[in-house]
Amino acid sequence: MFEGPVQNLIDELGKLPGIGPKSAQRIAFHLLSVEPQDIDRLTAVLVKVRDDVRFCTVCGNVSDDERCRICSDTRRDASVVCVVEEPKDVQAVERTREFRGRYHVLGGALDPLSGIGPEQLRIRELLSRIGERVDDVGITEVIIATDPNTEGEATATYLVRMLRDMPGLTVTRIASGLPMGGDLEFADELTLGRALTGRRTMV
Protein backbone atom coordinates (compact mmCIF):
# COMPACT_ATOMS: atom_id res chain seq x y z
CA MET A 1 0.00 0.00 0.00
CA PHE A 2 1.18 3.47 -0.89
CA GLU A 3 0.26 6.58 1.04
CA GLY A 4 -2.25 9.34 0.47
CA PRO A 5 -3.02 10.63 -3.04
CA VAL A 6 -0.96 7.96 -4.82
CA GLN A 7 -2.95 5.11 -3.27
CA ASN A 8 -6.19 7.03 -3.85
CA LEU A 9 -5.30 7.31 -7.54
CA ILE A 10 -4.47 3.58 -7.75
CA ASP A 11 -7.76 2.72 -6.04
CA GLU A 12 -9.80 4.87 -8.44
CA LEU A 13 -8.02 3.51 -11.52
CA GLY A 14 -8.63 -0.02 -10.25
CA LYS A 15 -12.39 0.59 -10.41
CA LEU A 16 -12.22 0.88 -14.21
CA PRO A 17 -13.26 -2.23 -16.20
CA GLY A 18 -10.36 -4.44 -17.19
CA ILE A 19 -7.90 -2.66 -14.89
CA GLY A 20 -6.46 -4.88 -12.15
CA PRO A 21 -4.33 -3.73 -9.20
CA LYS A 22 -1.02 -4.07 -11.07
CA SER A 23 -2.30 -2.22 -14.14
CA ALA A 24 -3.74 0.52 -11.92
CA GLN A 25 -0.39 0.92 -10.20
CA ARG A 26 1.46 1.04 -13.52
CA ILE A 27 -0.89 3.70 -14.92
CA ALA A 28 -0.67 5.74 -11.71
CA PHE A 29 3.12 5.87 -11.81
CA HIS A 30 3.04 6.68 -15.50
CA LEU A 31 0.82 9.67 -14.73
CA LEU A 32 3.27 10.76 -12.04
CA SER A 33 6.06 10.81 -14.62
CA VAL A 34 4.40 12.86 -17.37
CA GLU A 35 4.50 16.63 -17.84
CA PRO A 36 2.00 18.70 -15.79
CA GLN A 37 0.33 19.98 -18.98
CA ASP A 38 -0.42 16.38 -19.99
CA ILE A 39 -2.24 15.86 -16.70
CA ASP A 40 -4.10 19.13 -17.22
CA ARG A 41 -5.15 18.01 -20.71
CA LEU A 42 -6.41 14.66 -19.43
CA THR A 43 -8.29 16.34 -16.59
CA ALA A 44 -9.90 18.82 -19.00
CA VAL A 45 -11.03 16.01 -21.31
CA LEU A 46 -12.57 14.06 -18.42
CA VAL A 47 -14.44 17.13 -17.19
CA LYS A 48 -15.69 17.88 -20.72
CA VAL A 49 -16.95 14.32 -21.11
CA ARG A 50 -18.75 14.59 -17.78
CA ASP A 51 -20.33 17.94 -18.66
CA ASP A 52 -21.02 17.66 -22.39
CA VAL A 53 -21.64 14.02 -23.32
CA ARG A 54 -25.19 12.78 -23.08
CA PHE A 55 -27.31 10.03 -24.61
CA CYS A 56 -29.21 10.56 -27.85
CA THR A 57 -32.91 11.06 -27.09
CA VAL A 58 -33.85 8.90 -30.09
CA CYS A 59 -31.50 5.90 -30.05
CA GLY A 60 -29.55 6.07 -26.77
CA ASN A 61 -26.13 6.36 -28.40
CA VAL A 62 -23.57 8.72 -26.88
CA SER A 63 -23.80 12.24 -28.26
CA ASP A 64 -22.93 15.83 -27.54
CA ASP A 65 -26.37 16.96 -28.71
CA GLU A 66 -29.99 15.87 -28.27
CA ARG A 67 -29.70 13.75 -31.40
CA CYS A 68 -26.58 11.80 -32.27
CA ARG A 69 -24.80 12.17 -35.59
CA ILE A 70 -26.38 9.00 -37.02
CA CYS A 71 -29.97 9.88 -36.06
CA SER A 72 -29.44 13.37 -37.52
CA ASP A 73 -28.16 12.04 -40.85
CA THR A 74 -31.06 12.13 -43.32
CA ARG A 75 -29.11 9.88 -45.69
CA ARG A 76 -29.45 6.96 -43.26
CA ASP A 77 -32.33 4.54 -43.80
CA ALA A 78 -34.73 5.27 -40.94
CA SER A 79 -36.88 2.24 -41.81
CA VAL A 80 -34.22 -0.24 -40.62
CA VAL A 81 -33.08 -0.22 -36.98
CA CYS A 82 -30.21 -2.29 -35.61
CA VAL A 83 -30.64 -3.07 -31.90
CA VAL A 84 -27.39 -3.33 -29.92
CA GLU A 85 -26.51 -3.53 -26.24
CA GLU A 86 -24.04 -0.66 -25.79
CA PRO A 87 -22.76 2.43 -27.65
CA LYS A 88 -19.46 0.62 -28.29
CA ASP A 89 -21.43 -1.91 -30.36
CA VAL A 90 -22.64 0.91 -32.62
CA GLN A 91 -19.01 1.65 -33.44
CA ALA A 92 -18.33 -2.04 -34.11
CA VAL A 93 -21.16 -2.21 -36.66
CA GLU A 94 -20.18 1.12 -38.22
CA ARG A 95 -16.66 -0.16 -38.86
CA THR A 96 -18.07 -2.84 -41.18
CA ARG A 97 -19.51 -0.20 -43.55
CA GLU A 98 -22.25 -2.74 -44.29
CA PHE A 99 -25.11 -0.99 -42.49
CA ARG A 100 -26.74 2.28 -43.50
CA GLY A 101 -29.76 2.22 -41.23
CA ARG A 102 -30.11 3.58 -37.72
CA TYR A 103 -29.61 2.13 -34.26
CA HIS A 104 -31.27 1.52 -30.94
CA VAL A 105 -29.03 1.10 -27.90
CA LEU A 106 -30.59 -0.95 -25.10
CA GLY A 107 -28.08 0.03 -22.46
CA GLY A 108 -27.22 -3.57 -21.58
CA ALA A 109 -28.67 -7.07 -21.77
CA LEU A 110 -31.09 -9.10 -19.68
CA ASP A 111 -29.29 -10.54 -16.67
CA PRO A 112 -31.67 -11.51 -13.84
CA LEU A 113 -28.79 -12.59 -11.57
CA SER A 114 -27.48 -9.02 -11.70
CA GLY A 115 -30.94 -7.52 -11.30
CA ILE A 116 -31.21 -6.37 -14.93
CA GLY A 117 -34.70 -6.99 -16.29
CA PRO A 118 -36.65 -5.45 -19.19
CA GLU A 119 -37.44 -2.37 -17.08
CA GLN A 120 -33.75 -1.55 -16.76
CA LEU A 121 -33.22 -1.58 -20.54
CA ARG A 122 -34.48 0.77 -23.25
CA ILE A 123 -37.01 -1.76 -24.54
CA ARG A 124 -40.04 0.44 -23.90
CA GLU A 125 -38.38 3.19 -25.95
CA LEU A 126 -37.80 0.72 -28.80
CA LEU A 127 -41.47 -0.25 -28.85
CA SER A 128 -42.43 3.43 -28.89
CA ARG A 129 -40.10 4.11 -31.84
CA ILE A 130 -41.62 1.27 -33.83
CA GLY A 131 -45.10 2.56 -33.11
CA GLU A 132 -44.39 6.05 -34.44
CA ARG A 133 -42.93 7.57 -37.58
CA VAL A 134 -39.48 9.14 -37.29
CA ASP A 135 -38.59 11.70 -39.96
CA ASP A 136 -41.86 10.66 -41.68
CA VAL A 137 -40.55 7.11 -42.10
CA GLY A 138 -41.94 4.03 -40.36
CA ILE A 139 -39.70 1.22 -39.13
CA THR A 140 -40.12 -1.93 -41.25
CA GLU A 141 -37.17 -4.04 -40.04
CA VAL A 142 -35.51 -4.53 -36.68
CA ILE A 143 -32.12 -6.25 -36.72
CA ILE A 144 -31.25 -7.78 -33.36
CA ALA A 145 -27.48 -7.57 -32.89
CA THR A 146 -27.04 -8.40 -29.23
CA ASP A 147 -23.88 -10.22 -28.15
CA PRO A 148 -23.67 -13.99 -28.86
CA ASN A 149 -23.58 -14.95 -25.19
CA THR A 150 -26.16 -16.17 -22.67
CA GLU A 151 -27.41 -12.67 -21.78
CA GLY A 152 -27.43 -11.51 -25.40
CA GLU A 153 -29.38 -14.56 -26.59
CA ALA A 154 -31.89 -14.18 -23.75
CA THR A 155 -32.36 -10.53 -24.74
CA ALA A 156 -32.82 -11.47 -28.40
CA THR A 157 -35.43 -14.09 -27.50
CA TYR A 158 -37.32 -11.59 -25.35
CA LEU A 159 -37.27 -8.96 -28.10
CA VAL A 160 -38.59 -11.42 -30.69
CA ARG A 161 -41.46 -12.26 -28.35
CA MET A 162 -42.28 -8.57 -27.87
CA LEU A 163 -42.05 -7.68 -31.56
CA ARG A 164 -43.52 -10.67 -33.36
CA ASP A 165 -47.13 -9.44 -33.39
CA MET A 166 -46.37 -5.96 -34.71
CA PRO A 167 -47.94 -5.59 -38.17
CA GLY A 168 -45.66 -4.91 -41.13
CA LEU A 169 -42.49 -5.47 -39.11
CA THR A 170 -39.72 -7.91 -40.03
CA VAL A 171 -37.46 -9.01 -37.17
CA THR A 172 -34.05 -10.43 -38.06
CA ARG A 173 -31.05 -11.71 -36.09
CA ILE A 174 -27.45 -11.36 -37.19
CA ALA A 175 -26.15 -14.64 -38.58
CA SER A 176 -24.04 -17.11 -36.68
CA GLY A 177 -20.31 -16.91 -37.25
CA LEU A 178 -19.47 -14.73 -34.28
CA PRO A 179 -17.80 -16.75 -31.51
CA MET A 180 -20.24 -17.85 -28.82
CA GLY A 181 -19.65 -15.97 -25.60
CA GLY A 182 -17.90 -13.10 -27.38
CA ASP A 183 -18.68 -9.41 -27.65
CA LEU A 184 -19.63 -7.54 -30.81
CA GLU A 185 -16.96 -4.92 -30.16
CA PHE A 186 -14.18 -7.50 -30.49
CA ALA A 187 -15.43 -9.06 -33.74
CA ASP A 188 -13.39 -8.22 -36.81
CA GLU A 189 -15.07 -6.12 -39.50
CA LEU A 190 -15.26 -8.93 -42.07
CA THR A 191 -16.91 -11.43 -39.71
CA LEU A 192 -19.39 -8.91 -38.35
CA GLY A 193 -20.15 -7.61 -41.85
CA ARG A 194 -20.95 -11.13 -43.02
CA ALA A 195 -23.13 -11.70 -39.95
CA LEU A 196 -25.12 -8.57 -40.84
CA THR A 197 -25.44 -9.43 -44.52
CA GLY A 198 -26.46 -13.02 -43.73
CA ARG A 199 -28.96 -12.13 -41.01
CA ARG A 200 -31.84 -14.56 -40.62
CA THR A 201 -35.52 -13.73 -40.34
CA MET A 202 -37.05 -14.47 -36.94
CA VAL A 203 -40.53 -13.04 -37.57
Curated annotation (Swiss-Prot):
SMART domains: HhH1, TOPRIM
Similarity section: Belongs to the RecR family.
Organism ancestry: Bacteria, Bacillati, Actinomycetota, Actinomycetes, Mycobacteriales
Pfam families: RecR_C, RecR_HhH, RecR_ZnF, Toprim_4
GO BP term, pick one: DNA repair
Source organism (scientific name): Mycobacterium leprae (strain TN)
Designated name of the protein: Recombination protein RecR
Domain Toprim: 79-179
Keywords tagged on the record: DNA damage, DNA recombination, DNA repair, Metal-binding, Zinc, Zinc-finger
C4-type zinc finger segments: 56-71
Annotated GO MF terms: DNA binding; zinc ion binding
Superkingdom assignment: Bacteria
Gene3D superfamilies assigned to the protein according to its UniProt record, in alphabetical order: 3.30.60.80, 3.40.1360.10, 6.10.250.240, RecR Domain 1 (1.10.8.420)
Job of this protein: May play a role in DNA repair. It seems to be involved in an RecBC-independent recombinational process of DNA repair. It may act with RecF and RecO.
